[in-house]
Each structure stands twice: as C-alpha cells, then as structure tokens.
Amino acid sequence: MAPNHAGKRFSKPHLNDELSNLVFNANPASGPWQEYNFAPESRTQFPQEIFATEGNVQKASSVLGGRRGDMTLSGKDALITFDFYVNTCGMITLEFGELSASGQQVSIAFSESKAFVGRGSDRSMDFHVEDGALSVGVDGQGTRTCPDAQQRGAFRYMTLYMETSGTVEVCSVKTYNNMMPSMGDDLRQYPGFFFGDDEFLNTIWYAGAYTLQLATIPTGTGRRSDWVHKKVGWANDVPAALDGTLEVLTDGARRDRTVWSGDRALSTLTNYIALNNKISTKNGVDWMFKYQTDEGVFPYACPPIWHYGSDSYHLWTYVSLYNAYFFDGGDDAKDWVRQKWPAVKRGMDYALQKIDDTGLLKVTMPLDWGRHPLKGHNLEVQGILYFSLQKCAELAADVMGDEILAKKWSTLATSVKNVSWELP
C-alpha cells in the first residue's frame, strides 16, 4: 500500500555526517526518501477507507485493504464512496457474493478529488462529454472486471451505488494499476531520487515523479477523441504511439492521454531525472514525426485527438526531439536523429518561411495552451524559435556533420533574439 500523505508529518534529516553517509552511499530504491514516494508497492491496489455512505450499506469496512468481506448494498439509495488514499488507475474488479439478487444493476463513478465525488465521474473526455458512470449488471454471485475501454486513467475516489431496488453483496474491490508497464511489478524502484531537509519540497518532487508514472500509459490505451465520441461515457482504448511499442509518456493520465509536444517538452527533464525512461520519451517523439504533414507541419495534438494549427507547438516538437537526444546520448540516439533529419529540415523550412520583413516569425497557426489564440509577432513563439534553431544547429553539426546548415541556423537564431529585444 502506498503511504497516505494527507496530513502526515515526516521526520526531518539531520544535516550532519549521517546525512552525508546517506547521500554518498545512496541507493535510489532504499532510504528515507522512499517515505515520500507515492507509488504503490503492488500493481493490485485496494480501497483503504470509507469516504462516505448513503442509504442501506452494511459491513462496508469488511472489504477494505484487500480483505475479502461481505458488504451489502440494498435499495436504490444505497451508495458508498471508497478512498484509495492516493491517485491510482486501471481496471476495477468487483467480486459479488451469494447474497446478491439476480437482475440487479450497480454503477461506478470515479474522481481524483473529493470535490467531484458523486454519482458521475469527473471529466476525462474534455468539455463536450460527460463521463457519467460505468454500469455493471449483477446476476447473483460472480466477478466483474470493467472493459478495457473503460479503464480509468486516474482516480483516488470510487463511488459504487445501486441502480435497482434489490440487494448486492460485495466481497472484494480492487484495481489493477497498469501505468508504466516497463517497470514490472515494483513501481517504487525509481532510478533517481531526491532528499533534503524541506518536507514540502521532498513531497513535491515525488508527486511530480509519480504524476509522470501515471501519465506513462500502455500504448493502446489512448483516449478516444471527444469529437467522435458519444456525449456520455469515456473510452481509453486507441493507440497513442506506434504499433509494437510498450508505452508512451503523455500529457496526463486521466484527461488527454495524448502526446502534445509542448507538454512533453517540459515533462521530459523530470522523466529522465526521476525515472530515466528513455523509451517512453522517444516513443512520443516518434509519434509526433509520424504525423507530420507533407507541408512539414507537426501536430498540435497527436492522435487520437489529432489536431493541427499551432505555430508554438510545431516548434516545441524540436525541443522535444533535442531533449530526447540529449538525455539519451550515444550512437543510438544519433542514428535516431539521422532517421528523422529530412523531416527536421522540412519542418524547419515551414517555420522559417513565416519570418517576415521584421525578422521575426509571424504567427499564422494561433493555437496554444490554455490561453487566447496567439497572433502577430508573439514573443513566446520567437523564444521557442530561437531555442529550436540553436539546438537544431547543434544537431546539424554534431550529428549530421553539416557545418553550413549549422552556421545558417545559428546565425538566424542570433538574429531572432536580437530583433526580439527590440519589440515595442
């Protein structure tokens, strides 16, 4: 069971020889820093506490912590909300006992926050779709596991309630946490670690690492686009990376489950430091390059959302490429970049043709993250262009041996920077 961090006070280290010994003899998988680790000890996770009940619910605590019990729910107003103590994910399994009447119907709703606990799940499909609840038919004794498509990307609270007037007996409740399959069964064995005398900072670091674990999803569990999905429900059963790959780092576990170049440009560094997960990072970059258009445009959001129209995210793709190369290193990483080089140049040519007589890129694809559409000679875009030109010049020289192109892009980067400082 992962620790319950809510309201917990951690012991502070002594900044003396004892701490020095901890650091210099450190093993990332063992040490006092593991007290802050949110990752579970097992992929099979169980509810740990009752958050709320309504109506006729008996022996609710009998199924907590992995115990096999005999909880009953009777009547349409019967409801129970379980607290797993930490964000988890995956496929819920319920075992119904012999006291369960035939022809009954129960529903399951999920929430990451207690603010959204109820008979409907928090939104994972975007603004146009209500997730609602997962309906489960009960015909007496037996075990039910949610369909693969209805696996939940992230939740802490699970609400189970009756839709019919009879009784069901629940003997066990569990979820199989399928995040980051490359880690096997021990999800706490981080290659990296962090430890200091600030409890809050330690907690933030491990919360960030665990967030990336959750967001590293099995390849075939991307979220269906809400553009084509029905208006109620959710579905996490479509590819989010190339066939034959195991997993991919996405922008979020519950909601998008999709590769966005801008998001991963920021998460890649944390991913390498904490988890050293080269494959999930490179798989995401491969997915971006697969969906480059003939014109050279990279996606704003990769499939399954699959949307274009962003100059900033087009350029963020280069940041993602460079970060994956830089943190991987070695001849394999160079070969990986070489395979993409024609696409790198095609995409850069597309961006550079938007530089007008001001010497700056004029935005024509306005989409960006969480803000009004970009326009004109936006400074953010110039900054990303400058960085992309710098790093692609480095790749041109160090990987491709093309000093002429490296000089061209480096000179242009300097020009963009200088002109940007002159913006009114």
Predicted region positions:
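Active-site neighborhood of glycoside hydrolase catalytic domains
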Residues: 375-424
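Aromatic-rich carbohydrate-recognition surfaces in CAZymes
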Residues: 129-169, 197-205, 212-214, 218-221, ...
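Composition- and surface-driven signal marking solvent-exposed, interaction-prone regions
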Residues: 108-109, 173, 283-285, 401, ...
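Extracellular/oxidizing-compartment recognition motifs
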Residues: 2-249, 303, 334, 339
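A generic structural signal for short coil/turn motifs at secondary-structure boundaries
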Residues: 118, 146, 372-373, 404
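Polar low-complexity intrinsically disordered regions
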Residues: 1-6, 403-407
